[in-house]
Curated annotation (Swiss-Prot):
Name used for this protein in its record: Mitogen-activated protein kinase kinae kinase bck1
Catalytic function, reaction form: L-seryl-[protein] + ATP = O-phospho-L-seryl-[protein] + ADP + H(+); L-threonyl-[protein] + ATP = O-phospho-L-threonyl-[protein] + ADP + H(+)
Compositionally biased intervals (Basic and acidic residues): 524-533, 832-841, 871-885, 1128-1140, 1189-1198
Gene: bck1
Keywords of this entry: ATP-binding, Kinase, Nucleotide-binding, Transferase
Protein family per UniProt: Belongs to the protein kinase superfamily. STE Ser/Thr protein kinase family. MAP kinase kinase subfamily.
Biological processes annotated in GO: MAPK cascade
Lineage: Eukaryota, Fungi, Dikarya, Ascomycota, Pezizomycotina
Disulfide bonds: none
Annotated catalytic residues: 1453
Enzyme Commission number: 2.7.11.24
Organism of this sequence: Aspergillus fumigatus (strain CBS 144.89 / FGSC A1163 / CEA10) (Neosartorya fumigata)
Enzyme class (EC, first level): transferase
Function: Mitogen-activated kinase kinase kinase (MAPKKK), part of the cell wall integrity (CWI) signaling pathway composed by three protein kinases bck1, mkk2 and mpkA and responsible for the maintaining of cell-wall integrity balance. The CWI pathway also regulates the oxidative stress response, as well as the production of some secondary metabolites including pyomelanin.
Phenotype caused by lack of the gene: Leads to the formation of thicker hyphae, which appear less elongated and form more branched hyphae. Results in increased sensitivity to cell wall integrity inhibitors such as glucanex, SDS, congo red and calcofluor white. Impairs phosphorylation of the MAPK mpkA.
Length: 1617
């Protein structure tokens, strides 16, 4: 019989007519003895009467005859054709009439080629199994476990399909014939071979062993279930069609398919396999059923009907998705289609696959527990012959050889897929046994099945249904919880690989991949054994498939069901469960399977591998895994994981699947991290690498995050900030393998009792009680995470602790619950390892990461620690990347300036001066220096407005401290003998330079000098300068000293006053004065930058004052350093809001606002550094600049070193005068002489730029304003100083640096002894306030007279200059022309040109500063103007335009953006970049080119054609400006440039006046625009001139009642600041 079965499996060469040979072949087979017909469980249709063609029993031939097509033959080739009457079994429905005869060459992909071709006359099956007390299976009479050797099995395998059908048709097991008819038969009733009674699908199955496998009881059950809607897991039989059948659909003929797969069953199948309602509606609409349905997955070519899917199904599906509101997701639906094809292919392989068995259930049920006998008798009892895995090879000798012989079958198209094994399968299997009347099932098998968890029972449907052969002996293995699918295990184990389904059965979602497909078949294996062992493929097929690694998982796709994915994931967590993606899973016998299932699995042996499904029939696990991947494991309703971390380094995996309540979730997370007080812990969303966490998650957000972000791959990552992880500071945290300390037993929740702490005797003794009893979540109990300790940073390594084969959570739980001795031993070792890890972690954390728990004692007043807390020493904050700047009462000092070349020279000069003995008494209080040193240079420099600036000791030897406020120096100052000379005060760390200076004076001083120099290199220079200055204050030179004192010792808010005080006061009195006026500080830093001069900070600056004018040179240096370090210095030049946005370039503050906010507009300038001559307030006009040559001379002397940023020049010279003398070892008298020179004969102190600017502003207010059309209420107009012909030096700070740090401001120095003939103006450039076509406009201030002006700078790219010299020359010439043209213009409505400065690659034009903004910017910002404003502005513009035309100047670019509007309502024409001077202003000049802005151009400019144009183009542009002011937008606002050019040039059209404008403005205004827009036909003479419009047009009449200050526009623009 084995041989016969083999023959049955071996497809006979197709006879001329497949029907006849197959029938004859079937006829040759003796029908099995009639058996009592089992009731048709699960709605199985009663066996149909014998098929109309009274032919041979349903054997391969029968099927062939029915299929009568090449497909059938191919399937026969697959090897399923002959072997099994599965077709009959799989069909619960009446078999369709046999198809026309065809050659029975249906070999399943040549699977049976290894077998000898059975005789056509020979019976497909040698005999029919007679059910016995120990048999099971619907009508199959499957022998009891280990009874495979019974001839009945063999006979059963050879039974004709009709015979089987008779019995099986009634059984719960549905044949996977694809018809969906559950030919579930009583296991006790042998099917009667009858082609008639067998459904066409059965015949097909005969041809296709896979189909037959589906017809196995399991398959039948499935099919039937699918039809009946029951959840019983029918076994699937691989479709031969999938393999090689060309004519067979799903292993059945079209007629069989129609019977097996009616539309209802198709829809049910779709629903059970998780396809959306859109898919169901699509199939319903398209009436896809029967052969059409099966054809989708396995067409005639064995690949599936892609055309139908893409041309019909997907278009209709898209419509359904849109109609249902789901939305068409092409990628998703393509994936679904792919999954569907795989599932249908599995149906072909195992017809019962789809039958109403949810993939999830199947998976669960199919997975037999590892090492346990198959829970389903079907599995264990299925004869090997029934399927590749059906019987153990041992049971059926034929199986072994065939398996080996048919390995090629595994290469069949069948893909092994991880299929969810419906839990119902096991249930179904048990149900089948009952329903089918399979009392024959042995009690042992039944007990085994019962023992298996539903999940574990999950059998490989392919095995149960397709192969129908389950090795009974392997039941024990199936029981093994680790075998996800008993069948799979058997089959896959044989191959050495078990699908993830073979993994622990404990995991519901066992992976039923290729291997799993075996497992799925295994499930069917139970069923098939139960219901249709007759349909089992020949053992050969089974063996071959399994050995080949082919897994005919009935549910390759089903496994991909959501639940399957979940199952897989859960298993995946377990080391024993390979992830579905494991490629090794493809082979049922892959080592993975063996590993997971262990040697106990039934299929570890080749014989066991023989399952009903041939490996070839089974879809490869790879395909299954692919499907699962495609499907997305998240779809599994499995575990949800979250990564939680205490330190952002080490993450704990927490199972939050069942954490429905927020409290439970928080507790679980905190317990896993070892946080005892979970209620007070804060949880934040985080991502790897994230360090800052803003808001902790509240309960609502935490629950939302859990729902939306948690998944099986741990996408949800949480950062937990606990209060006290380890309540006992001395307690050494226990570490789980992850390196996370475990909470103490008392701190951990009961669930955390797992012995994760270091296992000492006590811990070991606690292990038994520790089993968590119902922890909120297994993880909680399982994994108490250690509290956030240093160790927490290390990646958790407890994972090893989890028992193998369990998910970490499970492992923990088990450990806690029942630690075995060996486990305890293991835990002990782990604990030892943990201790080591903990130690390392502590070391690591101590060096990196959050600070470790404080060891300090905590008292009522807070933490206390031993030792002295030095508040001067800032503690390092873990939250700061860089050391915070030392806190000081004043502004932060900028970083110490780098010593520039100038400073170097100055230093050298100063050194020389320092080398000179100073008059200062050598007696210097070391205490002062020491104190200052202890305070730190920053403290000394910044801590006090004026760090002690001891005045040089008076001649009497008294040391005058220049107000070192609060510094020890002052105290010393009081005692002149103690206080060191100014140098000494310089000795203070704050005054490094002073130290240097003192260095020469006394050795003590030099040391401090060195220190100070280290800290302040540049200060040293200043100090030296101060030293020299100090010399001048030497006691010997009382006058100098006094002058020095006046300059440095006594900080005065008023420079003059300070000067006076300095002159009069003694050193001590000066120090006192300083004390009185702490606001005044000497800006040594600025001095440093100047290099030559010492500058004082005005009280407003409140920067550290120099300790001493003379001796404080070093102190000044420190002070200057501090001043340089002042926040102003450090602060990046802020761009004022008014200049920050391009739309308000013109929103410039009035001059008063600029003066009041000089620091904002000149951020890099030390405005308080005294650098101007002390002649008094320099008048706003150039005369101030024209300082007497003496002053210049004196400045020159002082300024070489001091030349500050221009601001500090004169005063710096004065202040630095002392220093300068140091540079120029001239003695203290030099300072006095310099002062005298500056003042023109008397000692004076320099003025700061701020003072000069304020004085100029006040003077301008006090004097009458000379403005052409001054209006009431308009702001006073300044007459700016013309600088043409004068020498202009522009001083601009380098980006990010204070001007004081730059080279000294050039001083108005004239050669000594030579009178200064040419006035020199030093212009300090400030903020950018505008951008133009040809350059940028900066705010500027005349350092000599305090006037505010605008600096228009045009820079030429040096590269461009080198490449295009001609262009550069042309540009320069144009600029020169503009300057020459405009320098003499002076009109209240024209921006004044004040001067220019030419550089090698730039030209700077100095213009009158106009506050407010351009009319264009105001329009854009505030909208259109009211008519009264437009009228006034038009009149003013015409006035300026008439003046220009009178001067022979064409503006040629008149537009709103080029008319500036002052805050007083005065407008001024600006931007003469393309203006042109001509003799005949109103005569057309052919040389005039097309210049200007298109939208404001006159037609003649565009149409010039050599005729040229006159100044009347400006009148046209003025009309455009008026229209622009009325409309609030540019002319031709609806046209692009090209359109405007066309209409102007070709049509000579004027810009249209919008209706909203024409309807609201006065007729005079409208007439004015029309007059301006006069289009010249021959020339522009018809257009009025500016003077005509100004004097004669009614719109330009002056309104005596108009006051700009009362207009809405003024209200909008007045708040510029």
């Amino acid at each position: 019989m084995d041989g016969q079965r083999q023959q049955t499996y071996i497809p006979a060469p197709p006879p001329p007519s497949a029907t006849q040979p197959s029938q004859s072949h079937m006829l040759s087979l003796p029908p099995p003895p009639p058996r009592h017909l089992p009731t048709q469980p699960q709605g199985v249709m009663p066996p149909p009467p014998p098929g109309p063609p009274p032919g041979p029993p349903p054997g391969p031939g029968y099927g062939a005859s029915k299929l009568a097509n090449s497909q059938l033959q191919q399937q026969n080739n697959l090897g399923w054709q002959h072997n099994w009457a599965r077709q009959a079994l799989s069909q619960g429905f009446l078999p369709p009439p046999p198809p026309p005869p065809m050659v029975p060459t249906n070999q399943a992909y040549g699977r049976q080629t290894s077998f000898s071709v059975p005789n056509a006359d020979g019976p497909i099956t040698s005999a029919t199994y007679v059910p016995g007390s120990n048999t099971f299976g619907a009508g199959v009479g499957i022998p009891g476990f280990d009874a495979h050797t019974r001839p009945s099995y063999e006979a059963y395998g050879t039974m004709s399909g009709s015979d089987r059908i008779r019995g099986p048709v009634h059984h719960l097991y549905e044949s996977s014939g694809g018809d969906g008819s559950a030919y579930k038969r009583d296991g006790t009733v042998p099917p009667t071979p009858s082609a008639r009674t067998m459904p066409s699908s059965l015949a097909l199955h005969d041809n296709a062993q896979e189909s037959v496998a589906s017809s196995l009881p399991g398959a039948t059950a499935q099919n039937h279930q699918s039809q009946t809607g029951q959840t019983n897991e029918p076994t699937k039989s691989p479709s031969h069609r999938q393999n090689n059948s060309n004519t067979l659909l799903g292993g059945m003929s079209p007629s069989e398919a129609a019977v097996q797969w009616p539309l209802d069953r198709v829809l049910l199948w779709l629903a059970k396999n998780g396809f959306s309602r859109d898919w169901q509606e699509t199939f319903k609409t398209l009436q896809i059923e029967g052969a059409d349905f099966l054809d989708i997955g396995h067409g005639a070519n064995g690949r599936g009907n892609f055309n139908k899917m893409h041309n019909e199904v997907f278009p209709q599906l898209a419509k359904e998705c849109e109609a249902s509101g789901t939305g068409w997701d092409k990628e998703r639906e393509l994936g679904e289609g792919k999954r569907m094809r795989r599932l249908i292919r599995q149906i072909h392989d195992d017809d019962s696959f789809d039958v109403g068995i949810p993939a999830q259930k199947r998976r669960e049920s199919q997975a037999p527990s590892e090492g346990a006998p198959d829970t389903s008798p079907k599995l264990s009892h299925e004869p090997q012959s029934a399927g590749p895995h059906s019987g153990t090879i041992e049971n059926s000798p034929n199986l072994r050889a065939p398996q080996l012989a048919q390995p090629h079958r595994h290469s069949v198209q069948m893909r092994s897929v991880t299929l969810p094994i419906p839990t119902t399968h096991d249930i179904a299997s048990s149900d089948f046994s009952q329903k089918d009347g399979i009392s024959s099932r042995s009690d042992f098998s039944r007990s085994v099945l019962v023992g298996l968890g539903v999940d574990h029972r999950r059998q490989s449907p392919s095995m149960s249904s397709d192969n129908g052969n389950l090795v009974a002996p392997f039941r024990s293995y199936e029981d093994s919880p680790k075998s996800g699918s008993p069948a799979t295990q058997h089959a896959t184990l044989n191959q050495g690989l078990s699908s993830s389904s073979t993994g622990d059965l404990s995991v519901k979602y066992e992976h039923s991949r290729g291997n799993s497909s075996d497992s799925t078949m295994g499930r069917r294996y139970y069923e098939s054994r139960k219901g249709q062992e007759t349909i089992r493929p020949s053992p050969q097929e089974m063996c071959s498939r399994q050995w080949t690694g082919e897994t005919s998982s009935s549910y390759p796709k089903e496994h991909k069901g959501i639940f399957n994915f979940l199952k897989k994931r859960s298993k995946g967590g377990d080391s024993t469960h390979p992830s579905p993606e494991e490629p090794n899973l493809e082979s049922p016998t892959s080592p993975v399977n063996l590993r997971q299932n262990g040697p106990h699995l039934p299929y570890t042996k080749p014989s066991f591998n023989a399952s009903d499904m041939s490996l070839g029939e089974r879809p490869s696990s790879a395909s299954m895994s692919d499907h699962e991947r495609l499907r997305g494991k998240p779809a599994q309703k499995g575990k949800k994981w979250s990564f939680v971390t205490l330190d952002g380094w080490n993450y704990r995996l927490v199972d939050i699947t069942d954490m429905d309540s927020v409290e439970t979730l928080r507790a679980a997370i905190c317990h896993n991290l070892g946080i005892a007080d979970w209620a007070s812990a804060q949880i934040f969303l985080t991502e790897p690498g994230q360090s800052d966490h803003e808001e902790p998650l509240n309960d609502t957000m935490l629950a939302l995050c859990r729902r939306t972000k948690s998944d099986s791959i741990g996408s949800l990552k949480l950062f937990v900030r606990g209060t006290h992880l380890q309540p006992v500071p001395n307690h050494v945290p226990n570490f789980a393998g992850l390196g996370v300390p475990l909470p103490d037993k008392h701190t951990a929740s009961p669930t955390h009792h797992l012995p994760r702490k270091p296992l000492d005797d006590e811990a070991l003794s606690r292990i038994p009680p520790q089993p968590q009893t119902g922890p909120a979540s297994p993880q909680l109990g399982i994994r108490p995470q250690q509290p956030k300790t240093p160790a927490a940073k290390f990646p958790a390594r407890d994972a090893p602790q989890h028992t193998e084969g369990m998910s970490p959570v499970e492992g923990d739980q088990q450990v806690g619950i029942s630690p075995e001795p060996d486990k305890a031993d293991l835990l002990a070792r782990h604990e030892e390892h943990k201790r080591e890890v903990e130690r390392k972690q502590k070391a690591y954390l101590s060096s990196k990461g959050p600070p470790q728990p404080r060891n300090d004692s905590y008292g009522e007043t807070g933490y206390r620690r031993a030792g002295v807390i030095d508040f001067d020493e800032r503690r390092v904050s873990p939250y700061e990347d860089k050391k915070a700047d030392t806190l000081v009462p004043l502004r932060k000092p900028p970083s110490a300036p780098q010593e520039s070349y100038t400073l170097t020279r100055i230093n050298s000069l100063r050194k020389k001066d320092g080398d000179r003995p100073r008059a200062q008494p050598a007696v210097q209080t070391h205490g002062l220096g020491a104190v200052l040193a202890s305070m730190g240079r920053m403290t000394s420099a910044i801590g006090t407005p004026a760090p002690s600036v001891p005045t040089p000791t008076s001649a009497g030897g008294k040391q005058t401290n220049f107000g070192s406020f609060g510094s020890p120096t002052q105290g010393n100052t009081k005692s002149a003998p103690q206080s060191s000379p100014e140098k000494e005060s310089l000795d203070n760390p704050g005054n490094p330079a002073e130290h240097r200076h003192t260095k020469s004076t006394a050795p003590e001083i030099p040391k401090p000098t060195l220190q100070s120099r280290k800290s302040y290199g540049p200060e040293f220079d200043f100090e030296e300068t101060e030293v020299s200055f100090q010399r001048s204050p030497r006691p010997q030179d009382d006058s100098d000293e006094d002058s020095d004192d006046g300059l440095f010792a006594i900080p005065l808010s008023n420079n003059k006053a300070s000067t006076k005080e300095n002159d009069s006061g003694s050193g001590t009195s000066e120090a006192q004065k300083r004390t009185e006026k702490p606001a005044l500080t000497v800006n040594t830093e600025s001095r440093l930058r100047k290099g030559l001069s010492v500058s004082f900070r005005s009280p407003s600056a409140t920067r550290e004052s120099f300790a001493d004018a003379n001796g404080d040179s070093g102190g000044r240096e420190g002070a200057s350093f501090l001043m340089a370090a002042s926040p102003e210095d450090e602060r990046p030049p802020p761009r004022r809001d008014s200049f920050a946005r391009g739309d308000i370039w013109a929103s410039r503050p009035p001059v008063e606002g600029v003066i009041d906010n000089l620091d904002d507009f000149f951020p890099d300038i030390d405005l308080d550094a005294p650098y101007l001559d002390g002649q008094g307030v320099s008048p706003p006009s150039s005369p101030a600049n024209r300082a007497p040559p003496e002053n210049d001379l004196h400045k020159k002397e002082n300024q070489p070193s001091s030349s500050y940023t221009g601001e500090m020049n004169a005063n710096a010279g004065d202040t630095l005068g002392s220093n300068e003398p140091t540079l120029k070892p001239q003695g203290g008298d030099v300072v006095a002489r310099r002062n005298i020179n500056r003042s023109g004969g008397g000692l004076t102190r320099g003025k700061s730029i701020r003072e000069v600017a304020k004085g100029a502003n006040q003077a301008s207010r006090s004097r009458s304003i000379h403005t052409g059309n001054q209006k009431s209420g308009e702001i006073l107009r300044r007459k700016s100083t013309k600088m043409f012909g004068a020498k202009i030096m522009q001083i601009k700070p380098k980006p990010g640096s204070r001007l004081s740090q730059l080279d000294p401001i050039p001083q108005n120095n004239t050669p000594s002894g030579v009178p200064q003939r040419q006035p020199t103006f030093r212009i300090i450039r400030g903020q950018l306030i505008g951008k133009g076509t040809y350059g940028r406009v900066y705010l500027g201030i005349n350092a000599d007279n305090g006037e505010v002006l605008a600096v228009k700078q045009v820079e030429i790219n040096p590269r461009l200059a080198g490449q295009d010299t001609d262009r550069v020359k042309e540009m320069v010439a144009a600029m020169d022309q503009e300057i020459d043209t405009m320098q003499h213009l002076e009109h209240p409505n024209i921006v004044q040109y004040l001067g220019c400065e030419r550089g090698e690659f730039s030209i700077s034009i100095y213009l009158e500063y106009i506050s407010g903004g351009s009319i264009g910017s105001c329009l854009r910002k505030h909208g259109k103007f009211e008519e009264s404003v437009v009228k006034s502005l038009t009149r003013q513009t015409l006035s300026g335009l008439a003046y220009l035309h009178d001067q022979g100047i064409l503006h040629r670019d008149l537009k709103a953006d080029n008319i500036l509007l002052d805050l007083d309502g005065t407008c001024k024409i600006s931007d003469f970049g393309i203006s042109k001077k001509t003799d005949d202003i109103y005569g057309n000049d052919s040389s005039n080119s097309m210049q200007g802005s298109v939208f404001w151009m006159a037609p003649e400019v565009i149409q010039s054609q050599g005729q040229g144009y006159s100044a009347k183009v400006d009148i046209w542009s003025l009309g455009c400006v008026v229209l622009e002011m009325f409309a609030g937008r540019r002319p031709w606002s609806k046209e692009e440039a090209i359109g405007a050019i066309f209409k102007l040039g070709s049509l000579s059209q004027a810009p249209p006046i919008p209706d909203d404008v024409s309807m609201t403005i006065s007729p005079a205004a409208l007439a004015f625009m029309y007059d301006c827009f006069t289009v010249p036909y021959r020339d522009s003479s018809e257009r009025p001139t500016a003077q005509t419009l100004l004097t004669r047009h009614p719109f330009c009449e002056e309104d005596p009642n108009y006051n700009f200050l009362d207009t809405e526009l003024y209200a909008k623009i007045r708040h510029v600041l």
